[in-house]
Amino acid sequence: MRQHSRMAVAALAAGANAASFTDVCTVSNVKAALPANGTLLGISMLPSAVTANPLYNQSAGMGSTTTYDYCNVTVAYTHTGKGDKVVIKYAFPKPSDYENRFYVAGGGGFSLSSDATGGLAYGAVGGATDAGYDAFDNSYDEVVLYGNGTINWDATYMFAYQALGEMTRIGKYITKGFYGQSSDSKVYTYYEGCSDGGREGMSQVQRWGEEYDGAITGAPAFRFAQQQVHHVFSSEVEQTLDYYPPPCELKKIVNATIAACDPLDGRTDGVVSRTDLCKLNFNLTSIIGEPYYCAAGTSTSLGFGFSNGKRSNVKRQAEGSTTSYQPAQNGTVTARGVAVAQAIYDGLHNSKGERAYLSWQIASELSDAETEYNSDTGKWELNIPSTGGEYVTKFIQLLNLDNLSDLNNVTYDTLVDWMNTGMVRYMDSLQTTLPDLTPFQSSGGKLLHYHGESDPSIPAASSVHYWQAVRSVMYGDKTEEEALEALEDWYQFYLIPGAAHCGTNSLQPGPYPENNMEIMIDWVENGNKPSRLNATVSSGTYAGETQMLCQWPKRPLWRGNSSFDCVNDEKSIDSWTYEFPAFKVPVY
């Protein structure tokens, strides 16, 4: 955080608060606050597009019941000399509620956030951008191709990182003028998002680091090529092993694994807080022969690999979802079913045995492996998740198709080739893996990075790998102790025991952090650095319990049922560490 006097900031806020809501929420005031063309290099504002309307007693943010008065503003700009048009929505708190803050919310799937009101709860101006491709109504995957073989690179770069960075830079400038603040006044700027919203947050930290004071990034979908193709991996395992397990068999394998590994962390509470100990000590073959039963019903694929937990700030979270009938399933776990599960948890390797990517932690749901019932044949068949299939068709094959029709002639080597093609093609846009965060760190930025340990969509180890890359690149000349001490001053990473994708887990009643923004604001504005992360258990025997989670690389170990220690466990940490020799270039 750049150093500013708290007294000076308070004085600025007082000045802003002195203005009336009706005085500031006008088209003329917004136009006067716009940056003059040439002020922000490459940005030319379009004053004729400005709108400003006061709104009263409006709800704001996802799931909030609190109401606010705010100024609903629309502005537009063009990239100098290009002739395009980008529309931005801003929500300005009434002056008495403004607390010198700017807030950016992430989206999810292939959608940027379309809601500008998320910052109102924090006294912050918020924004949302259409990114120049009408992102309020279109998701990026709908516009990524102009036609077969032709990539829409403008939309790609805007979705990848550019649109949010420009929205933030423009928004902070307008904010100062809107409230009558001086041009050198401080506006604390925050980002918050999960899933692709987490990736978007990392893109801002990596490429627009000097614009932000604090970023909260959950389960980032970075390493985009590997992540998206990985959604096809489970189907390829089933095809390669020629076994398509009934969904109930996989559920039994997962639930039996949870039951077996639950006590390894020192407390039996239905939560596998130490998937590393599970990986090191539990053998899936011990489940062979156990009975399973599931009643007939329908199954809904939630799209983008989401499981049945709460999610935050996702515009089209059911994108790619399908519903299918499932008959009653009754049987025992087979050796072939266990082989499928084990191969998925082991991760993708090429035909030479070289590792290409990491996978989900053992005890995570095997959502991508869910097969589809064919009522004509009475058999379970391949069900390719559109999450990964669409990425292959549109981003790799450059065909305007929503999914792969089959995996004929596809091998593990094919998946590696797809990953490599995507990594190279989108290295400077979607991949989002730059490990040198010096501009963000040196300008005082704070990064709170978290990931559900049992995430069935984006592997938790993906976040661990990136944290390790940042440590290695930025502090490779320091001892491990020195590097950890330096990192925790500005970059803190937390695994959430038992948690699923961007939310709680219906299979494991574990804790989940609920006040990350309050923690971040206190860290940035008051200098109160956290050492552990506050999280609350919302269901099960321990519902209502508050847990202070361990900061990586320390791991939790319960002492009885009431408290746990954060311990160093090198063998366990090693189980989270990966190299990817299947690729010829470093994979951060």
From Swiss-Prot:
Q: Which family, according to the similarity comment?
A: Belongs to the tannase family.
One Pfam family name is: Tannase
Q: Does the keyword Lyase apply?
A: no
Residues the record marks as site: Cleavage: R316, Q317
Name of the featured protein: Tannase
Instruction: Write the record's keywords in alphabetical order, separated by commas.
Output: Calcium, Cleavage on pair of basic residues, Disulfide bond, Glycoprotein, Hydrolase, Metal-binding, Pyrrolidone carboxylic acid, Serine esterase, Signal
Q: What does this protein do?
A: Hydrolyzes ester bonds of tannic acid to produce gallic acid and glucose.
Gene Ontology molecular function, alphabetical = feruloyl esterase activity; metal ion binding; tannase activity
Q: How does it assemble?
A: Heterooctamer of 4 33 kDa and 4 30 kDa subunits linked by disulfide bond(s).
The record's active-site residues are: S195, D455, H501
Catalytic activity, EC: 3.1.1.20
What PANTHER family does UniProt report for this protein, alphabetically? CARBOXYLIC ESTER HYDROLASE, FERULOYL ESTERASE B-RELATED
Please tell me where Ca(2+) binds in this chain.
D262, D265, D269, V271
Q: Which reaction does it catalyse?
A: digallate + H2O = 2 3,4,5-trihydroxybenzoate + H(+)
InterPro entries annotated for this entry? AB_hydrolase_fold, Tannase/feruloyl_esterase
Source organism of the structure: Aspergillus oryzae (strain ATCC 42149 / RIB 40) (Yellow koji mold)
Q: Which residues carry this modification: Pyrrolidone carboxylic acid?
A: Q317
Q: What class of enzyme is it?
A: hydrolase
Q: List the disulfide bonds.
A: C25-C71, C194-C502, C261-C278
* Signal peptide (from-to): 1-18
What does UniProt say on post-translational modification here? The protein is glycosylated to a carbohydrate content of 22.7%.
